[in-house]
């Protein structure tokens, strides 16, 4: 029987490396592709960290309500509590942990949105108050300016009226020209006005006509 070079080489290789020979595809043979095993959708590692797989079950309304009630009591999930909830709901502990993790993330996002809305409303109110106060300041400045102009106008009117009044001018002139004691001067010893009085003898009777004649 005649062998080709390839057949001789293959026979030689099979004797030296039997394990390698089994992996070499013979001429004319078709290598069947290996089928990859599909992973179950939604499957994750078991809670104890082993290689076991579980199918993620869709939660019922009752299970969701019980999880929501438990989350309302305490946002953090401890190991004992996780196992107890999983046993009560008939779920895998890992699925309960994932649900709590997602629910806590939504709760934090909601809190951030609420805080943001509160701060935004406070900021808007402060801006409105600021605009209102600025408007009041402008109005008060205008009123102050008008009041200052009115005070200045009244002051100018009073000054102009007092300087041009004829009554005040005549009174001031007469007061300067008329002495307080007339043409008589009053000395310190009183001698200057002794001639205005006439001595009257004691025990003498002077009638009214004679008394008046002394000063006429």
Swiss-Prot record:
Q: Describe how expression is induced or repressed.
A: By abscisic acid (ABA) and by salt stress.
Instruction: Answer whether the UniProt record assigns the keyword DNA-binding to this protein.
Output: yes
GO process terms (BP): response to auxin
| Region spans: Disordered | 28-52
Tissue occurrence: Expressed in roots, flowers and siliques.
Q: Name one GO molecular function term.
A: DNA-binding transcription factor activity
Q: What function does this protein fulfil?
A: Probable transcription factor.
* Name of the protein this chain belongs to: Homeobox-leucine zipper protein ATHB-40
Q: What is the source species?
A: Arabidopsis thaliana (Mouse-ear cress)
């Amino acid at each position: 029987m005649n062998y080709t070079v390839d057949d001789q080489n293959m026979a030689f290789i099979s004797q030296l490396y039997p394990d390698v020979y089994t992996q070499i595809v013979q001429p004319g043979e078709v290598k069947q592709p290996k089928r990859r095993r599909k992973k179950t959708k939604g499957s994750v590692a078991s809670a104890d960290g082993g290689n076991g797989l579980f199918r993620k079950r869709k939660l019922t309304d009752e299970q969701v309500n019980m999880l929501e009630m438990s989350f309302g009591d305490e946002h953090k999930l401890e190991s004992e509590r996780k196992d107890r909830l999983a046993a009560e709901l008939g779920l895998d502990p890992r699925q309960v942990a994932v649900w709590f993790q997602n629910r806590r993330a939504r709760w934090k996002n909601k809190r951030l949105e609420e805080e943001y809305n509160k701060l935004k409303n406070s900021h808007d109110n402060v801006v409105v108050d600021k605009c209102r106060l600025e408007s009041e300041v402008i109005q008060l400045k205008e009123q102050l300016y008008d009041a200052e102009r009115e005070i200045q106008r009244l002051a100018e009117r009073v000054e102009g009226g007092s300087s041009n009044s004829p009554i005040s001018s005549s009174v001031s002139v007469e007061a300067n020209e008329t002495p307080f004691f007339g043409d008589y001067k009053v000395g310190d010893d009183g001698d200057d006005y002794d001639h205005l009085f006439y001595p009257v003898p004691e025990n003498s009777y002077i009638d009214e006509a004679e008394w008046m004649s002394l000063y006429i």
